[in-house]
Regions:
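Class I S-adenosyl-L-methionine
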Residues: 1-108, 112, 116
Length: 118
């Protein structure tokens, strides 16, 4: 299973309970290093895949590899994972796999910055 999770605009108070639970249930968490730092208090005992800016494709490929192996994987994005987040890229990469090899995927929406500002 791979879950693509929006963690909100940065503060833990802006993360939805669903996003929090999805991260806690994961055994592997992948994300941009800055976002990993924002949730480091949730990552004890987890395999962490952190990469820098401009390494989104590599990060998603590594996360998908872990999910294919049977791991419960969370890919975190700031804001909402579907709005300038990682959901589109993860889905695009999954479509390149043979259908029988694709792990289940779930998109966990988060609070986008535009909604937080309202």
């Amino acid at each position: 299973m791979i879950k693509v999770i929006g963690i909100g605009p940065g503060g833990k108070e802006d993360m939805t309970p669903r996003a929090l639970n999805a991260i806690l249930e994961a055994d592997t968490v992948a994300g941009y290093n800055t976002y990993i730092k924002l949730i480091k208090h949730l990552l004890d005992g987890k395999n962490v895949i952190g990469t820098g800016m401009m390494q989104e494709v590599d990060r998603c490929k590594m996360a998908i590899e872990e999910a294919v192996k049977g791991h419960n994987v969370a890919v975190v994005s700031s804001g909402d994972s579907g709005v300038y987040g990682m959901a589109g890229l993860v889905l695009e990469l999954l479509l390149k796999l043979p259908k029988e090899e694709r792990p289940q995927v779930q998109i966990v929406a988060g609070l986008s910055a535009v909604n937080a500002a309202a």
